[in-house]
Amino acid sequence: MKNILNRLINHETLSKQEAKNMLVNISNGSYNPSQIASFLTVYMMRNITINELAGFREALLELCIPIDLSAYNTIDLCGTGGDGKDTFNISTLASFVTAGAGIKVAKHGNYGVSSISGSSNVMENLGIKFSNDPIFLEKCIDQAGICVLHAPLFHPAMKNVAPIRKELAVKTFFNMLGPMVNPSFPKNQLVGVFNLELARMYSYLYQNTKTNYTILHSLDGYDEISLTGNTKTITNKMEGMLKPEDFGVNLLSQTDIQGGTTIQESAQMFVTILSGKGTEAQNNVVCANAGMAIATVNNLNPIQGFELAKESLLSGKGLETLKKLQQLSL
C-alpha cells in the first residue's frame, strides 16, 4: 500500500489490473483503516481514470454474491448519489412507479453516506426485508414486480470500507461504482451520475456490454432528472438533451424537490408521494424519472413513458407495489 500511495501522491495513475488488485486486497483485510481512508482521499482530490474505474468495478463484480434474475427483463433505477443536493428519494419512488406500470425492477441500493437518507434507510423504515435469498427475491419480483437488493448483503467484500465511508461522510469513488455493480446484472439500467465526466466514463464502459441503458445528468448538478433545468442523456443508441417541456411540464425550483431532514420524515414523504398526495412538482419529477425508465425498457419517447408513469402513480398501482412488498417482508 505504501508504494501505491506514494505513486498516487506523485500524481501517477493505476492500471486496470492494479486498481482491481487494490480493491481485492482491501476486501481481504490487507490494509488498516488509515491506509484505506488515505487511498479513498486521493480520489476526492483528482478525477478517477477509466482504467481505474473499470478495475474497481471488475473487482466488485467478481467478489459479489450474484443473484440470477435473468428470467426477467429487469431494470435498475439507481443514482450515484454524492450530488450534494439532498432531494427526496426520487429514484426509489420512481422504481415503485415503474414497477406499478408493469416493468420488473431490481432496485440496488444502500444506506445514505453523503445524504441524510439513502434508499435503504427509507426501505428499512417502511418495513422492507433485506435478503440475498434468491427464492425470496424471485417471489418479490413475481408478486410485487420489484425486489430490493441491499448492497451490503451482496458485496460482503466491502465490510472493511463501510465504516470508513460513514465516518468520512463525503462522496468517494464507491458512489461512482454503486449503479455499476448491481449483483443481478439487470438487462436495462437508468443511471444518474453527479457530473458530465462520469457520464462519459459510464457510457464508455457500458457500450462494451449488452446492457440497454440511459445515463442521466442534470446540468445543474443533480444525479437524476430534476426538472430544474436540462438533463444530458446518453443511451446505447444516441446522446441528447431533455427539457422539462419534453415531458409536458414546467420548470421546477430546487426547493420543490427538497428531501426530509430525518429518515422518518423522508419515509413519511415517500408514502405521501406514492399515495398520490404529493405536490404537482413532486409527482412530475418522480414520473419524469419513472417515465424514462419505462421508455428505456419499452423503447418509447419520454412523454409516452411519462404518461404511463403518471397513470401508475395516480391510479395507486405504485402504492400497491409497495404494500405487496411490505406484506412479503413480514
UniProtKB/Swiss-Prot annotation:
The keyword Transcription regulation does not apply. Its EC number is 2.4.2.18. 5-phospho-alpha-D-ribose 1-diphosphate binds at residues 79, 82-83, 87, 89-92, 107-115, 119. Keywords: Amino-acid biosynthesis, Aromatic amino acid biosynthesis, Glycosyltransferase, Magnesium, Metal-binding, Transferase, Tryptophan biosynthesis. Mg(2+) 1 binds at residues 91, 224. It catalyses: N-(5-phospho-beta-D-ribosyl)anthranilate + diphosphate = 5-phospho-alpha-D-ribose 1-diphosphate + anthranilate. Binds 2 magnesium ions per monomer. Pathway: Amino-acid biosynthesis; L-tryptophan biosynthesis; L-tryptophan from chorismate: step 2/5. The keyword Amino-acid biosynthesis applies. Anthranilate 2 binds at residue 165. GO terms for biological process: L-tryptophan biosynthetic process. Transmembrane segments: none annotated. Mg(2+) 2 binds at residues 223-224. Anthranilate 1 binds at residues 79, 110. GO terms for cellular component: cytosol. Its cofactor is Mg(2+). GO terms for molecular function: anthranilate phosphoribosyltransferase activity; magnesium ion binding. Belongs to the anthranilate phosphoribosyltransferase family. Catalyzes the transfer of the phosphoribosyl group of 5-phosphorylribose-1-pyrophosphate (PRPP) to anthranilate to yield N-(5'-phosphoribosyl)-anthranilate (PRA). NCBIfam families: trpD. Homodimer. This is Anthranilate phosphoribosyltransferase. The gene is trpD.
